[in-house]
């Protein structure tokens, strides 16, 4: 008997075991992220922490109470989240549980692009000045804090209303984080580039400035000409057309590829043939 091969197989089995558990936990977190179940999980973790501490310090009464809470709590979870559990099982049966999160993110990204395009085209035609910065991997919390926090679901109507002249939020930048308008009337750093045309105003200088220190995508609508400009990576792209803007936003902001058929759907398709 070759014990070396057995030990290698045992080692590989352990790796696969860990990867499968990690994958399942990751998918569960992705499924419940942004739902009320997240708050419930936080509460469960707190109870578990209290139980461990009470056991360590010998607090028998507290430990007994936490044991009862955990024992009956899981039953309560099944009852409270029965609709969510049913939907999750139905999703598993349809074979798209592993693509649900990616599809949702992709829809949000396309909604973001559509909202930016509609609002900028509307404002450009009416020469309403605007400055919209979309945060990506580099954190922009310092700049968000300089403005008025909104944390509002993004829409073209809301973006337009923010930049209507003589309204409290029109002066400054809108910063988008994720699929939300994080803040309005935020201050962005101005670029010191000597190559920036002097005919460009503060909005363009701020758009270029933020692109020099973050990986954000920033869109500017000129109130003088109605032209739409875009900055990224320390570069300024002036007077971009509607088609050019769409191509750039699609390339830079959509990170999820088109949904592919899952193993389950392939299996079902093969069985039906």
Curated annotation (Swiss-Prot):
Keyword tags: ATP-binding, Cell membrane, Membrane, Nucleotide-binding, Nucleotidyltransferase, Transferase, Transmembrane, Transmembrane helix
A GO CC term assigned to this protein in UniProt: plasma membrane
Cofactor: Co(2+)
InterPro entries reported for this sequence: C-di-AMP_synthase, CdaA, CdaA_N, DisA, DNA_integrity_DisA_N_sf, DNA_integrity_scan_DisA_N
Task performed by this protein: Catalyzes the condensation of 2 ATP molecules into cyclic di-AMP (c-di-AMP). c-di-AMP is a signaling compound secreted into the host's cytosol where it triggers the cytosolic surveillance pathway (CSP), a host pathway of innate immunity characterized by expression of beta interferon (IFN-beta) and coregulated genes. Expression of truncated proteins (missing first 80 or 100 residues) in E.coli leads to c-di-AMP synthesis.
Family (UniProt): Belongs to the adenylate cyclase family. DacA/CdaA subfamily.
Identification of the protein by name: Diadenylate cyclase
Source organism of this protein record: Listeria monocytogenes serovar 1/2a (strain ATCC BAA-679 / EGD-e)
Lineage summary: Bacteria, Bacillati, Bacillota, Bacilli, Bacillales
